[in-house]
């Protein structure tokens, strides 16, 4: 809002309950001439909002990227590079069996972050294990469920990379329920830098995004787009910063040890 105010522009936030409602809201704002341009966050791979605005030749800037970049301006964080670095950090600790819990595949960032994870594994000379790569976790509850699934594997990972912090927070309760400790028995690294990551114990190691800088750049890019600059000249990326917590470190348990502890925890629950 500060960047917009400095240029005497007003920023209005519009929310909706779903895609159809959001598209209707965009069309209404355009028809009523209540907006000169739009910032579109959390972009889909084939974003319907982007397609609508592009077809109507209405200025917009994406907070993210899309599969078809024609006519698109954007600001985005290189989440794929963060995922690659997360893998290499875990490998430097001594981990060799590393799982991946991604976000919803409808979002473009999920595909990019999976690419980054794959690249990190390749750079480390490690084979990908498809059954240790899961997706669809955008919430704490989903993260907990998928963490339980990975840690209940016949040969579970000793470390897990999460595409989003919200899902990573669910790993704490999942690990506890299975008789494991995050940061010791299982290492995790995530991405987003949400405040809640500092409240868990041990604090979450994550790649942090400066939301204030992102908001400022998005507003500045949109104003330039409204003033007629070509979208191809308004494409910026930045990197996330590693925020070290206590959730990752050298493996204190092997995959085999994790199996034994999980089985013991389940037996204890039954009895």
Question: Model-derived features: where do they sit?
Answer:
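Alpha-helical recognition/docking segments in bacterial nutrient-uptake
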Residues: 1-88, 152, 270-271
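Residue-level detector of anion-binding/catalytic polar loops
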Residues: 8-10, 59, 96-97, 127, ...
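Periplasmic-binding protein-like
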Residues: 34-41, 99-101, 133-134, 154-164, ...
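Flexible loop/turn connectors
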Residues: 146-271
